[in-house]
Amino acid sequence: MRYLLSLLTLLGAAAMAEPPTVLVFGDSLSSGYGMDVDRSWPALLQERLVEQGYEHRVVNASITGETTEGGAARIDDALSRFAPALVILELGGNDGLRGFPPARIKDNLRTIIEKSRARGAGVVLLGIRIPPNYGPRYTRAFEDVYRELAAELDVPWVEFFMQDVALDEALMQDDRIHPNEQAQEVLLENAWPAIKAALESLQVSGRSAQ
């Protein structure tokens, strides 16, 4: 009887265990701005994970208008609340459009990455590009932020998250800044190889069970 009770307790605990979390931590490119959030790329990512047999749940903690400084300020709370196995980091576009110093952007992204890893989470970095409003020197320095961080911290990354979207008017909203609903599948395809590789790496290391 004691063995049976112990077994039932273990089975009950396993049944109540929450699936590992994939945390999307971004800005309006990921928040579902201007569309039904159920058709945003993070929502499509959840569908993709289910289709491919992953047990992970996707939590979208993206905020429209968010900067890297804002993200760095709230990452601790997000990590405590959701205990993610994987953080998909998509920030920096608002910083670049406002001409914030690339060094500051890099420091903020580094903080988010390092804090996520310190909590045991893997990280995927989604690279952003901006129009050359501030000249070629600033534009290059901004783009180098993602490349350099990926190399320095050995972070899986996507060089240009908005590839095949940013210059296609049919996939952009009227403001020519935000992707529309039709673009979400393209964004998912851009990010998916890095996300899948990160999930497989976490499974090998055993961290996906968190």
Identify the role of each PLM range.
Residues 16-64, 74-83:
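Serine-esterase "nucleophile elbow" of acetyl-processing enzymes
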